[in-house]
Amino acid sequence: MAPNLRKSHPLLKMINNSLIDLPTPSNISAWWNFGSLLGICLATQILTGLLLAAHYTADTTLAFSSVAHTCRNVQYGWLIRNLHANGASFFFICIYLHIGRGLYYGSYLYKETWNTGVILLLTLMATAFVGYVLPWGQMSFWGATVITNLFSAVPYIGQTLVEWAWGGFSVDNPTLTRFFTLHFLLPFMIMGLTLIHLTFLHESGSNNPLGIVSNCDKIPFHPYFSLKDTLGFMFMLLPLMTLALFSPNLLGDPENFTPANPLVTPPHIKPEWYFLFAYAILRSIPNKLGGVLALAASVLILFLAPLLHKSKQRTMTFRPLFQLLFWTLTANLLILTWVGSQPVEHPFIIIGQLASLTYFTILLILFPIIGALENKMLNY
């Protein structure tokens, strides 16, 4: 009998073991779709980004007009740009849901997979930030100024660090050039990290909604989950196309229709919606260094998830107390996102401070306490 090329060829064998004959738990739900959706997002962003980069000029005098030229004169340039800008939003929606799934079902106990995932999130955030600066509109410029300025909070070397990042004494042409370089480079780094992430995942196999070992009940990934994932793609591509074609500027900032002007500060400087929760935490602390540390901690706290797991059960499926805590955390993040978009005025300041405090309290204090308490209640 002739050997099956899919299983014997050195390259095809790897693809086969990752996407075709991969043994998968039979009971994983639609929440396990987001990994492959993130892969689709990455591929779409790299493709549209490559086409945009072909028409973009990384120079302060030309950047804004080169983006306008792409939208007006390049064949389907408007569509490519709208897909790229809104694709970033969908990338973040998917990654946040993917992380939420990981927290809910205890997937963070696969420590290597989880840690590479958090590094992926940080790289994605960096990529999105430098990408937002490239159109060189008002919010691009002032967003870059405000966020890079945070490095000056680092004791002793802060100011040097900022000037080194800027390539001068303010955000200017060198800054734009290096941000374009980084924005081009980082997605390929994300691709590499994704492969590492998948390698670690396939070492242990997927988790499942019950959080129990499922070796006795595995099914091949193709055709079952490849088909299920295709449905997920449809569900993501439909709203993405709707957004890109009907209201492409819904999630953008109107300030970005004005070319960057260092002499005029916009009334409200705020990042894209997917960074608002972290921005709210940054703003809620009146001290600069404290704010920067809280901002970093808001994301880096994910590294601690495996250490804060005290329950004998892996998932939250059969833990109502923990579920209550999880959905409180979700609501809290939505409140932080909303507060981040509001001006720094009376009710919003205190709401932001309370929401920030609640965020860290739930993750650092209540998660381990409730986990231990549930063990007691179940006589574990």
From Swiss-Prot:
| Annotated positions binding heme b b562 | 84, 183
- Gene (name only): MT-CYB
Q: Which InterPro entries match?
A: Cyt_b/b6_C, Cyt_b/b6_C_sf, Cyt_b/b6_N, Cytb/b6-like_sf, Cytochrome_b, Cytochrome_b_C_euk/bac, Cytochrome_b_N_euk/bac, Di-haem_cyt_TM
In the record, the note on similarity to other proteins reads: Belongs to the cytochrome b family.
Residue sites binding heme b b566 per the record: 98, 197
Which PANTHER family does the annotation name? Answer: CYTOCHROME B (PTHR19271:SF16)
Say what the protein does: Component of the ubiquinol-cytochrome c reductase complex (complex III or cytochrome b-c1 complex) that is part of the mitochondrial respiratory chain. The b-c1 complex mediates electron transfer from ubiquinol to cytochrome c. Contributes to the generation of a proton gradient across the mitochondrial membrane that is then used for ATP synthesis.
The record's cofactor note says: Binds 2 heme b groups non-covalently.
Stretches assigned to coiled coil: none
What residues form the membrane-spanning segments?
34-54, 78-99, 114-134, 179-199, 227-247, 289-309, 321-341, 348-368
One GO cellular component this record assigns the protein to is: respiratory chain complex III
Protein origin, superkingdom: Eukaryota
Instruction: Kindly list the organism's lineage.
Output: Eukaryota, Metazoa, Chordata, Craniata, Vertebrata
Compartment(s): Mitochondrion inner membrane
Gene3D superfamilies, A to Z:
Cytochrome Bc1 Complex, Chain C (1.20.810.10)
Question: What interactions and quaternary structure are annotated?
Answer: The cytochrome bc1 complex contains 11 subunits: 3 respiratory subunits (MT-CYB, CYC1 and UQCRFS1), 2 core proteins (UQCRC1 and UQCRC2) and 6 low-molecular weight proteins (UQCRH/QCR6, UQCRB/QCR7, UQCRQ/QCR8, UQCR10/QCR9, UQCR11/QCR10 and a cleavage product of UQCRFS1). This cytochrome bc1 complex then forms a dimer.
Which Gene Ontology molecular function entries are recorded, alphabetically? metal ion binding; ubiquinol-cytochrome-c reductase activity
Note the topology in the membrane. Answer: Multi-pass membrane protein
Question: Any remaining note in the record?
Answer: Heme 1 (or BL or b562) is low-potential and absorbs at about 562 nm, and heme 2 (or BH or b566) is high-potential and absorbs at about 566 nm.
CDD domains recorded for this chain?
cytochrome_b_C (cd00290), Cytochrome_b_N (cd00284)
The record lists a ubiquinone as bound by 202
Query: Under which name does UniProt file this protein?
Result: Cytochrome b
Organism equals Grus nigricollis
Give the chief site where it resides. mitochondrion
Instruction: Please give a single GO biological process term from the UniProt record.
Output: mitochondrial electron transport, ubiquinol to cytochrome c
UniProt keyword annotations, A-Z: Electron transport, Heme, Iron, Membrane, Metal-binding, Mitochondrion, Mitochondrion inner membrane, Respiratory chain, Transmembrane, Transmembrane helix, Transport, Ubiquinone
